[in-house]
Structure formats: C-alpha cells, structure tokens
C-alpha cells in the first residue's frame, strides 16, 4: 500500500510536506510555538487558522528507499524557507519529550528521543504515531 499526499502523489523518502488536519475547520497545519517558559519556539503545535499550512516538514526513513510506506520508521524535521534566529544553528528534527509527552524540536546536543514516528492509515486518511523504543511495533 502506498501513502499519498493531498494531491494524490506518492510520499517520497526525504520529501517536503505540509502536515494538515484530515478535517477542515479544525485548525491549520503544524508549526512551532513557545510553551512553558521557552525562549525560542520549540514545541510542535497546530496552527489556529485553517488557512495557515504551518511549516514544511521533511519526512524520511533511514533506509535509502524511494517511497515511504505505512509502518516505516520515520524521522520528521521542519524545513522552513527562512528559519528564525532561534533556529538557524539547531536541528528542527522532532522528538518526544518524556516528561510532558509533547513533540519538541531537539537541540543538536540532545539527539536522544528522535523519532521514530510512523504514518498509519486511519479511516480514509492517515495519522502520525510515535513509537517509543520500548513499545511493540
């Protein structure tokens, strides 16, 4: 089974995509925001406006394959065209913070906790799932 983007194109390993909600009227795409005393926006959140596509995200699987399929272990990293001063020197790769269970942007010194994420079919759409190393896959 192949994963398709909103244009019906196959998801390419390393491709850049906007991650949008399945249903309109429920907010926009995913972006970064400051939470809990952060000096730079490091938390992945959904944009409030449904017209805001959020930030483009690169989605890739470590194996060198052309197409992303359901259940593949994936890394996700924001790739803004014009990164803010806060993000010019840091990775924008996603990780899950253990204490809060929030998706955060990892700083270069803290590579622990990157992914893996998976894309799974859900009804007529897809959902992103975080897979903790300790969980069954």
UniProtKB/Swiss-Prot annotation:
> Which residue positions does UniProt flag as site: Reactive bond for trypsin?
64-65
MF terms from GO for this chain are:
serine-type endopeptidase inhibitor activity
User: Which domain of life does this protein belong to?
Assistant: Eukaryota
- SMART domains assigned: STI (SM00452)
Q: Which PROSITE patterns match?
A: SOYBEAN_KUNITZ
Q: So what does this one do?
A: Inhibition of trypsin.
Entry protein name: Kunitz-type trypsin inhibitor alpha chain
What organism, scientifically named, is this protein from?
Answer: Neltuma juliflora (Mesquite)
């Amino acid at each position: 089974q192949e994963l398709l983007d909103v244009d019906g194109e196959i998801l390419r390993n390393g491709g850049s995509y906007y991650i949008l909600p399945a249903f309109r009227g429920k907010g926009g795409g995913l972006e970064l925001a400051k939470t809990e005393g952060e000096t730079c926006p490091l938390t992945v959140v959904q944009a409030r406006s449904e017209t805001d596509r959020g930030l483009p995200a690169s989605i890739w699987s470590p194996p060198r394959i052309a197409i992303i399929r359901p259940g593949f272990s994936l890394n996700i990293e924001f790739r803004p065209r014009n990164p803010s001063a806060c993000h010019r020197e840091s990775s924008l790769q996603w990780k899950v913070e253990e204490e809060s269970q929030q998706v955060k942007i990892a700083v270069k010194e803290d590579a622990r906790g990157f992914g893996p994420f998976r894309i799974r079919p859900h009804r007529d759409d897809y959902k992103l799932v975080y897979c903790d190393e300790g969980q069954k896959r």
